[in-house]
């Protein structure tokens, strides 16, 4: 005959069961930060989304929002990047390959299909983004790197130590698009995020006007945005760290700072501190 369970034993069993339930219920919530799509944020509570509620304070993963290096408020991307502002950046030389390729309409089309870029963005961050675009493309003059094919032929931009992103024969992974996406691993990761096989067809970035901006948005939200909370200088290091090492490249970093200050002026916002890298 089984020994009757005492009141103390029943209480201990209830307490142990309660602790077990708390632990097992809380784990799935915490683990949700691995389940969001690449262009969605995981909130501090473990849910996916693209607004400030998800990408703001406490954001655990994804394209989390920063304070913009100075806490300036979020603005409407469409209302801030007007045709006049956009066109003021364009290089108006008649021989520019990018003339007619980079347009305000295609910029907005790309932003609408990649909502996490502009869902909660500040004027200062907009100025920072376009400062890097201006430097990388010559004020949106160049669609692809001038000497890119020659560099690709010599084996540059193909990192063989990343076998998960194999370089396709006859393909070059040199700079293309609004922020000059480079290297096989970036083409691979970006292509996966955008559902495009960019490892097999990297040239698509220089052929598709919307994709040329979407790759820039991907690079920005994945590699640059979180650095911006430390000031513009940190974004220079994130985009091209070689420009922070002195020598001739220092002039290019100075250009980025100048453009950033100029665009902040156009948008009526202070550039903040920590401009250099």
UniProtKB/Swiss-Prot annotation:
One of its GO terms (molecular function) is endochitinase activity. Residues 75-277 are annotated as: Catalytic. The keyword Magnesium does not apply. Induction: Accumulates during senescence and in response to 3-amino-1,2,4-triazole (3-AT) and silver nitrate. Induced by viral infection (e.g. cucumber mosaic cucumovirus, oil seed rape tobamovirus, turnip vein clearing tobamovirus, potato virus X potexvirus, and turnip mosaic potyvirus). Induced by pathogens. Glycans are attached at residue 274. Pfam families: Chitin_bind_1, Glyco_hydro_19. The keyword Membrane does not apply. Belongs to the glycosyl hydrolase 19 family. Chitinase class I subfamily. This is Endochitinase CHI.
């Amino acid at each position: 005959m089984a020994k009757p369970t005492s009141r103390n034993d029943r209480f201990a069993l209830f307490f142990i069961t309660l602790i077990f339930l708390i632990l097992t219920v809380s784990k799935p919530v915490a683990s949700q930060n691995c389940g969001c799509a690449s262009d969605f944020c995981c909130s501090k509570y473990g849910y996916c989304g693209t607004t400030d509620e998800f990408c703001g304070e406490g954001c655990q993963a994804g394209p989390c929002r920063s304070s913009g290096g100075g806490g300036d408020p979020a603005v409407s991307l469409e209302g801030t990047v007007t045709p006049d502002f956009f066109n003021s950046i364009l290089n108006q030389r008649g021989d520019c390959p990018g003339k007619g390729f980079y347009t305000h309409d295609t910029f907005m089309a790309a932003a609408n299909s990649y909502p996490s870029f502009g869902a909660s963005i500040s004027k200062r961050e907009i100025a920072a983004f376009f400062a890097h675009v201006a430097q990388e493309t010559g004020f949106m003059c160049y669609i692809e790197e001038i000497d890119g094919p020659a560099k690709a032929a010599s084996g540059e931009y193909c990192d063989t130590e990343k076998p998960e992103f194999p370089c396709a024969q006859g393909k070059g992974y040199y700079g293309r698009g609004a922020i000059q996406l480079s290297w096989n691993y970036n083409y691979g990761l970006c292509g996966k995020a955008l559902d495009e096989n960019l490892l097999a067809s990297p040239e698509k970035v220089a052929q598709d006007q919307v994709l040329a901006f979407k790759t820039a948005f991907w690079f920005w939200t994945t590699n640059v945005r979180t650095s911006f909370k430390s000031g513009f200088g940190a974004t220079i290091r994130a985009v091209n760290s070689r420009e922070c090492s002195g020598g001739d490249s220092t002039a290019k970093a100075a250009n980025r700072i100048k453009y950033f200050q100029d665009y902040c002026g156009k948008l009526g916002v202070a550039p903040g501190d920590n401009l250099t890298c």
